[in-house]
Design a protein with these regions (language model features):
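A short beta-to-alpha transition loop/helix N-cap that caps and shapes the active-site region
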Residues: 22, 75-80, 156-158, 170-172
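Short, glycine/charged-enriched secondary-structure capping and boundary segments
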Residues: 3-8, 27-30, 54-58, 81-86, ...
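Contiguous beta-strand/loop segments that form the cofactor/metal-binding neighborhood of enzyme cores
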Residues: 107-177
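Structured beta->alpha junctions
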Residues: 18, 44-47, 72, 127, ...
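Alpha/beta-hydrolase-fold catalytic nucleophile elbow
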Residues: 16, 71, 163
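Beta-strand-loop-alpha-helix segment that lines the small-molecule cofactor/substrate pocket
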Residues: 1-47
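Predominantly a Rossmann-like dinucleotide-binding segment in NAD(P)-dependent oxidoreductases
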Residues: 46-119
């Protein structure tokens, strides 16, 4: 809502992730920015971090990629309130809340930035009070699979593993701290 107002006023806009709750809304914002001749950016910067460039550089050393695993799971400080009926933006569908849009977007950006758009995508979520509190997104690429996990209802150490025929790359931090 605020992004649209700023674009209509002819302002350049940086939007926190996700850019919009749906592809259709994203296209509307992009078209508006083009018409107004202003810039519209999403604030996910993972692909521009120095260590991300290093991962890209090291990928050929592990041979043919076969499996990719990304896990960004952190017990939300707002989860208990959510369970008690206090729905804050992080758990509000109208605000693009939930595990997919709040956390898994970093995993997806990481994977798609390295390997491009997948052939198929499937999302299996744990739904609580109508919103995904955790879930697993699988991406099917020609020759390999990627699994992207995110949770707001439980925690685990961040772990990113890219497995190839000659080795693997392991990152022990979230994608946005690449």
């Amino acid at each position: 809502r605020y992004a649209r107002v700023a674009l209509e006023a002819g302002k350049h806009v940086i939007v926190e992730k996700p850019l919009a709750p749906s592809a259709a809304q994203t296209e509307e914002l992009v078209e508006l920015a083009r018409r107004k001749k202003v810039f519209l950016f999403e604030a996910v910067t993972t692909q521009y971090l120095e260590n991300y460039a290093k991962i890209r550089e090291l990928l050929p050393r592990i041979g043919t990629v076969k499996l990719v695993q990304c896990n960004f799971s952190q017990y939300s400080s707002r989860y208990d309130a959510f369970c008690a009926g206090d729905v804050q933006p992080a758990f509000d569908l109208a605000c693009a809340g939930g595990a997919l849009m709040d956390l898994n977007v970093y995993n997806i950006s990481y994977i798609v930035g390295l390997f491009g758009e997948p052939n198929r995508v499937n999302y299996a979520a744990n739904i609580d009070h109508g919103i995904d509190t955790s879930g697993i997104l699988t991406m099917d690429y020609s020759g390999f699979k990627a699994v992207s996990m995110a949770a707001k209802d439980c925690g685990a150490p961040a772990r990113y593993v890219i497995q190839g025929t000659k080795g693997y790359l392991l990152q022990k931090s979230t994608a946005n701290f690449c």
